[in-house]
Amino acid sequence: MFFKRWFWRIFLFFIAVIFVYQFWIFSQIVYWNYFNPSSSAFMQTRLETLREKNTKAALRTRWIPYEQISPHLKRAIIAAEDAKFLEHEGFDFDAIQKAYEKNLKKGRLIMGGSTISQQLAKNLFLSGDKTPWRKLQEAFITLMLEKVMSKRRILEIYLNVIEWGNVVFGAEAAARHYYGISASSVSREQAARLAAMVPSPRFYDENRNTPWLSKKTRMILGRMASASIP
């Protein structure tokens, strides 16, 4: 009886901790629906890694409002990362199935099926650990984002916090880093190239003339006309 009582106390304690953590995440999402996040979990992790080698290391990032971001870049990102962004409620099960089949065929992870909302959930709150708990938490956060925020707000935050190169985060910093212009002035071709870099931004920052990057840029250009933006 003694052990049973303590088991339930410990169990309920862990349930309470999980509930409090979920509530904290939810409150952050509600707050960020009205106020811009100054950083993200991924940005902080990246900065800590950089400062292990250089204590003065800093990230290059500058917030730019949604209406000032080039429509070309919005279309390019949706065409490249989440063609059904406006249609789904956080998860594109067709893309997940396609990625699973392709990875199974190749015998290794070569394609992801994450939506923009899922990617934002990871960027804002989670570590890079690939565990069942992390995937479950990602799903919960994705649902919260979709319920609290509009698609426009999700895309706005996404474009401002994702990594786009070595110490480069967000569309404005990326446009200035690669082209010396504001994200408001990015052309179709420049937007497609920036979108093509998203899966491996640090690699493409150092290898900007790889044939695969050029090929992927052309593929994205071909899809942009059919991409719908919020």
UniProtKB/Swiss-Prot annotation:
The EC number(s) attached to this protein equal 2.4.99.28
Q: Please, which domain of life does this record's source organism belong to?
A: Bacteria
Q: What is its main location?
A: membrane
Enzyme kind, highest EC tier: transferase
InterPro entries on file:
Glyco_trans_51 (IPR001264), Lysozyme-like_dom_sf (IPR023346), PBP_transglycosylase (IPR036950), Pep_trsgly (IPR011812)
- Is Phosphoprotein tagged as a keyword? no
Q: Which GO terms describe its molecular function?
A: pentosyltransferase activity; peptidoglycan glycosyltransferase activity
Q: In which pathway does it act?
A: Cell wall biogenesis; peptidoglycan biosynthesis
Which reaction does this chain catalyze? [GlcNAc-(1->4)-Mur2Ac(oyl-L-Ala-gamma-D-Glu-L-Lys-D-Ala-D-Ala)](n)-di-trans,octa-cis-undecaprenyl diphosphate + beta-D-GlcNAc-(1->4)-Mur2Ac(oyl-L-Ala-gamma-D-Glu-L-Lys-D-Ala-D-Ala)-di-trans,octa-cis-undecaprenyl diphosphate = [GlcNAc-(1->4)-Mur2Ac(oyl-L-Ala-gamma-D-Glu-L-Lys-D-Ala-D-Ala)](n+1)-di-trans,octa-cis-undecaprenyl diphosphate + di-trans,octa-cis-undecaprenyl diphosphate + H(+)
Q: Where in the cell is it found?
A: Cell inner membrane
Q: Which residues cross the membrane?
A: 10-30
Query: Keywords assigned by UniProt?
Result: Cell inner membrane, Cell membrane, Cell shape, Cell wall biogenesis/degradation, Glycosyltransferase, Membrane, Peptidoglycan synthesis, Transferase, Transmembrane, Transmembrane helix
Q: Membrane topology type, per the record?
A: Single-pass membrane protein
The keyword ATP-binding appears for this protein? no
Q: What GO biological process term is on the record, naming one?
A: regulation of cell shape
Disulfide linkage: none
Cross-referenced NCBIfam families: mono_pep_trsgly
Question: What biological function has been recorded for the protein in this entry?
Answer: Peptidoglycan polymerase that catalyzes glycan chain elongation from lipid-linked precursors.
Q: What is stated as this protein's family in its record?
A: Belongs to the glycosyltransferase 51 family.
Protein name per UniProt: Biosynthetic peptidoglycan transglycosylase
* Recorded name of the encoding gene: mtgA
